[in-house]
């Protein structure tokens, strides 16, 4: 290798260090390490250890839409409904994946803010109209809000495709809320 016998000024050394760091950060190995660390946080959160991921998100200023959705889901898993709504309000103008909107819908439902929840269920369903979990979430929220007949109609539509145990439980829940105890046992 060639080496220069002349000394570099501090600004040149600083610029070279910065350039080297930028090249290293852009390398596939560096990106892989960052992705592996992020994936490890998500895996831990799925196991129930949500605090490391929540702390990581709180320290970041620039997040992708998928990372925002991850934050919303993990905060929901942690039972932090108010944090879910705070994060959503901060990033509400982003185009989030459906799972992000669904997490916020559940948080609003948990806080008994039915109309806000229904609005978010509709947003999630506009992105994934065939998602049965989102359809059921909307149906249960309609029932919580006292719209029993609408909830039952939507549930019957969902059941027409393929009835399942979750739908039977949802139906019993709706009948119970509506005070129709004889129907909840069918």
PLM feature spans:
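Register position in tetratricopeptide repeats
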Residues: 46, 77, 110, 144-145, ...
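N-terminal leader/linker segments that initiate helical-solenoid repeat arrays
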Residues: 23-86, 95, 99
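TPR alpha-solenoid repeat register
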Residues: 67, 100, 134, 167-168
